[in-house]
Amino acid sequence: MSDLEKIRLKRLAKLQQTNSEANSSKEPKESNIAPEPKKPDLKKRFIGSKATTSNSEQKEISPPVTSGAPKHRLFSKDEWMHFITCQALNITLSETDSSKYYLEGFKKDLEEEGSPLLFNENNVDSALLSRLSTTGNNTFSYLLQSWSFLYQYKKRLPKDENQDFKIHYLSLLKSLLVSYAGIVVMLPDTFNSETIDLAEVLIGAEGIPLEFLSEFVQRFEHENLDELFIPVLESLSLKIGLMNVDTVQMNVMQIILQLVSLKPIALLLPKLPSWNPTNNAGEIEYKTFLGRISSLSVFTQDVASRYFSNSTERSAQNISSSISSLKLTMSTYQDVLFQIFNTLIRTSTSLRESVLDFFAMVVNANHKRQSIQVNHFDITSDACMLNFSHVLSRLSEPFLDIGCSKIDRVQVEYFRRNPRVDIKEETKLNADQKASESFYSKPAEGSNNFISDIFFLNLAFHHYGVNATFKALEQLVQSIRDSEKLKERLETEQQNMSGSFQATRLTAQLSRLDQRLDLDRSFVHCYEIMLTQTSDTSRSFSFLNFVAIWLSRLADGQSSTYPKMPLSLPFNENAPEAFKCLPEYFIETITDYMLSLFKTSSSTLTLHSLEPLCEFCVSFLTQANYIKNPYLRAKLAEILYFGVQTHVGRSELLLDVVRTSKVATRWLLPALMAFYIEIESTGQSTQFYDKFNIRFYICEVFRTIWKQPAYFGKLEQEQKTNLPFFVKFVALMLNDATYLLDEALLKLTEIHNLQSLLADAISNSNSNQNVQESQSNLAAAERQASTYCQLGNETIFMLKLFTSSIPKAFCAVEIVDRLAAMLNYNLQALCGPKCSNLKVEDPTKYHFNAKTLLSIIFDVYLNLCNEPAFVEAVAHDGRSYSKEIFERATSIMTKHNLKSSFDIEAIKEFVNRVEAFRLQEATEEEDMGDIPDYFLDPLMFTIMKDPVVLPRSGISIDRSTIKAHLLSDATDPFNRTPLTLDDVTPNDTLREEINTFLKSKRNKHSRNSE
C-alpha cells in the first residue's frame, strides 16, 4: 500500500470520528473560524508570481507572539514547537484566541489522553488533519501559505543552542504540508476539495514557490509524478503555442523553465504524448512540446496590422519604436527559450540525446523549405525555425572562441557515424550520388561527440531556417514590387476608362490591391524584427565564420593548423573525398547569409574580423575540384563585390582586409582572372547571360583593388608569368565589351523609336491597345538597356585600366584586330550620322552617358596609339574606321572639354599614322594584282602568313585567325568539332608558295619603280 493510500485511509478514519462527535455537539461559532493566514511577503521565489518586492519593501518576518505569552520570555522546546505550529498552521487550542482556528475536538482528545495542551512533533500530524477538515476548496492554498511561512521563518532563524532542533521541527512541518498538498492535488476527494488545476495555480497571481515545488517533486518522485506533471507540461505548452508576440505571457515560459530545472520533471518530457509524435514538418509547432514553446512569432496578421499598418504614412520614428519594442519582447522570450533547452541538455545524457534527436527530426523534415515553390502547410514556420536556430547558435557559442581552439573537435567523420543530419539526397560539392554513397557506406570508428552534433545541426538550421527565411523575405519584397507595378498599370487604365463599368471594376480591384500591399509591407517589418536582431546576426556570423575556417582547414590537408598558420595555397589538385562529399549547402549557407548581411549593410559586419571570410572567398573561387558548381563559387565573387563597395553610412567593409591580407594580395587578382575565364561556360542553358552578371562583380572588384598599392604591378606580373592565360582573359573581356555595347546601343535606338512612337500616338489619340502595347515594349527595352549599359560600362572601363598598364598585351596578334574593330564600331555609333538615334529621355535611367562613354573609348585609343600593331589593326578595319568620324569625335571632345589639348593632338597624330599606313597598304595591294583564293584566309580574307591545317575539316587557315577563334570557341569553325591549338599542323608547302608569290610581286614592283 502506497503512502498516499495509507494517509487517505487514516484521514477517512479520523473524519468518521470527527463526524460522530459533531453530531452530539453544537457547531463552532463563526467567530471561532479564523480567516486564512495572511500571505507572507516573499521576494521572488514564486513560480508564476507577478508580484515582486523591492529591497526597500522587505520586512523581516517574525512569528507574532500569542496574547497569553509574555513578550520577552524565552520559550522552552515544547513551548516553541507549540508556538511555531500555531503561527504556521494558523491554529490554536485556546478558545479565546479569535485570530486563529480553534481545534476544539483535537483539544478534547488531548485532554482525554492526559497529554499537555501543546502541539508537538507527535501530534502535529493529527492537528493538521483536523484543520484540513475545515478548509474546503481552499485546502491547497492553505497548505501552500503555511509552507511559505515556515520557509521564510527558517531562512531568518537566528543561531542559538537549539538551532538544529528547530530546523528539524520546521522541516517536519514543511514535509507534512508538502505531503498533504500532494494528497489534495492527486486525491482531492479526501478533503472534499475541488480538483486542483496545477497549471492554472502555477500561472496564477500567487504562483508556487520554487522551493515548495522542489520539495514536492522530491517527495513524490516515485509516486505517480508523471500523472501529475505531464498534464501540466502539456497544458503550459499549449498556452504558449496559442500566443503571439503581442499576447505572450512571459511568466508561462518562466514557469516551464522552473519546472524543467527540477530533474525529475525534466526527465518526464520524453514520456509526453507531445514529445515527438510526428515527423510532419507542418505539425511540429502544434503537436510537439518543444515545437509549441518555440513557436512564438511576429509573423501574424494581427501583429503586422497593429504595429505596421499604413506604414507608408507612419513616421520613421514610429516604425523604429515598434520594431525596437517587438525586438525586445522576442529577445526576452528567446533568452528564456534557450535556458529551457540548455537546462534539458544538461539534465542527463539520455535527455540530451532526446533533444538532439528532436532537432534532427525537425531539420530533416524541412528540406522543402529551400524549394522554389512550397505549400506552407508542409513546412515548419519561419518563426519556429528561427527560434530553433537561435537556441542552436547559443549552444554553439562555447566552441566559437577567437582562436578556434576547439575546431579539431568538429569531427570530419561525422557523416560516417550514424549522423543525425540527413544529407543523403543533398547535392554534394564534387561527388555524384554513386560516389557519395560509396564514400559514406564505409563507416568510421568511434562515436560522434556533442560539439559535432551541435555544429552540423546548427549549420543545417541556418540553411533551412535562417537562409530560407531570408529567401522568403526576398520573395515578399519582389511580390511588393510586382504589385506596385500592377497598381500603376491599373491606375493608368482606370484614368483611360473614366466613367465606364470597367472603371468601377478597376476601383474595386485597386482597393483589394492596396489592402494586400499594406499587409505585405507590414510583414516586411516583421521580417526585419526576426532577421536583424544584432545579437542573433552576430552569433550567426561567428558560427558561419567558424564553418568557413573549418572548411578551409579541411581543404588544406590533414596537417593544417589554420588559422594559427596560413593556408598552403593553392590547394592540392586532388580534393579530399571527405570534402567533395559534403553537401553544397555547407558553402551556400555561408555565402547566402553573408550576402544578406552585406546587402543590408548590417552593423554586425563591423563587430568581427572579416579576414577569414575574405581568405575563404579567395581560396575557393577557382577551386573547381573542390566546389564543382560554378554558380556557387560565383557567390564568393559576389561577396567580394559587396564587401569592397561603399555602402550607405558604412565604408568598404572588406577593403582593409583585401589591402592587407597576404592571401588576398597574392592570390586575388589571378583568381578573379581565372574565374572570369572559367565562367564563360557553366554548362547551363542560361550560361551566355549568366556570365555577364558574374563578370560585372569581378570587374567591380578589379576596379576597386586597382587603386590599392598592394596590387600595383600585379597585372604585369600575371602577363609575364602566363601569357596564354592572360591573352585568353583579355580576349573574353573584349568579346564582352563588343557584345554588351552593341546590344546597349541597339536597345537605346529602340527606346528612341518607341518614345517617338508613343509621343505621336498620344498626340493623335490612338487606341489604348496600341499605346499599351508600345508601353509594354518600351518597358522591356528599358530593362534590357539598363542592364546592357551597366555591364558594358564596367567592361569598357576595365579595358581602359588594363590598356593603361600593359598596352603591349592588347596588341597580341590574336586580339588586336578585334579590339580595333570594336572601338571603331562604337566610335562610329556615338559620333556617326545615326548618333541622333541614341537620344532618349532621361538617359541616366539606363546608366547611359554618351560623353562619358566616348571619353573612355578615347582613353583606350590613347593608351594604345603608340603601338604599331594597333595602328595597323585600326587601318585594316575597312568596315567602321573613318577619318571623318575621328574628326567629329575630337570636335565633340574639344567642345565639351572632355580631353586636354595634348590628348587631342595625340589622337590627331594617331589618325595621321593610320591614314599613312592605309595609303601604303592600298599601294601594295594594287601592286599585288590578282591573288589566288587559296592564299586567302577563309575567315578574314587576307593573305595568310602562317597557314595551318585543321585536322578534321582539312581546311587551311592562318594561325593567328584560328588562335583568335579558339580564345572564345574551342571548336573547328567549319564543322564545330572540338579543337585545340595543339591539334593543328603547319602547312609548310602553302606557306612557301605564298612567300614565293609575295616575293615575286615585290621584285616586280621594285623593277617597275626603277
From Swiss-Prot:
<dbReference type="GO" id="GO:0005634">
    <property type="term" value="C:nucleus"/>
</dbReference>
<dbReference type="InterPro" id="IPR003613">
    <property type="entry name" value="Ubox_domain"/>
</dbReference>
<dbReference type="InterPro" id="IPR013083">
    <property type="entry name" value="Znf_RING/FYVE/PHD"/>
</dbReference>
<keyword id="KW-0963">Cytoplasm</keyword>
<keyword id="KW-0833">Ubl conjugation pathway</keyword>
<feature type="domain" description="U-box">
    <location>
        <begin position="930"/>
        <end position="1004"/>
    </location>
</feature>
<comment type="similarity">
    <text>Belongs to the ubiquitin conjugation factor E4 family.</text>
</comment>
<comment type="pathway">
    <text>Protein modification; protein ubiquitination.</text>
</comment>
<dbReference type="InterPro" id="IPR019474">
    <property type="entry name" value="Ub_conjug_fac_E4_core"/>
</dbReference>
<dbReference type="Pfam" id="PF04564">
    <property type="entry name" value="U-box"/>
</dbReference>
<dbReference type="GO" id="GO:0036503">
    <property type="term" value="P:ERAD pathway"/>
</dbReference>
<dbReference type="GO" id="GO:0005737">
    <property type="term" value="C:cytoplasm"/>
</dbReference>
<feature type="region of interest" description="Disordered">
    <location>
        <begin position="13"/>
        <end position="70"/>
    </location>
</feature>
<dbReference type="GO" id="GO:0006511">
    <property type="term" value="P:ubiquitin-dependent protein catabolic process"/>
</dbReference>
<keyword id="KW-0539">Nucleus</keyword>
<dbReference type="GO" id="GO:0000209">
    <property type="term" value="P:protein polyubiquitination"/>
</dbReference>
<dbReference type="InterPro" id="IPR045132">
    <property type="entry name" value="UBE4"/>
</dbReference>
<comment type="function">
    <text>E4 ubiquitin chain-elongation enzyme specifically involved in polyubiquitin chain assembly. Binds to cdc48 and elongates mono- and diubiquitinated ERAD substrates presented by the ufd1-npl4-cdc48 (UNC) AAA ATPase complex to a chain length of 4 to 6 ubiquitin moieties. Delivers these polyubiquitinated substrates to downstream ERAD components, which target them to the proteasome. Enhances ubiquitination at 'Lys-48', but not at 'Lys-29' of the Ub moiety.</text>
</comment>
<dbReference type="Pfam" id="PF10408">
    <property type="entry name" value="Ufd2P_core"/>
</dbReference>
<dbReference type="GO" id="GO:0000151">
    <property type="term" value="C:ubiquitin ligase complex"/>
</dbReference>
<keyword id="KW-0808">Transferase</keyword>
<protein>
    <recommendedName>
        <fullName>Ubiquitin conjugation factor E4</fullName>
        <ecNumber>2.3.2.-</ecNumber>
    </recommendedName>
</protein>
<dbReference type="GO" id="GO:0034450">
    <property type="term" value="F:ubiquitin-ubiquitin ligase activity"/>
</dbReference>
<feature type="compositionally biased region" description="Basic and acidic residues">
    <location>
        <begin position="24"/>
        <end position="44"/>
    </location>
</feature>
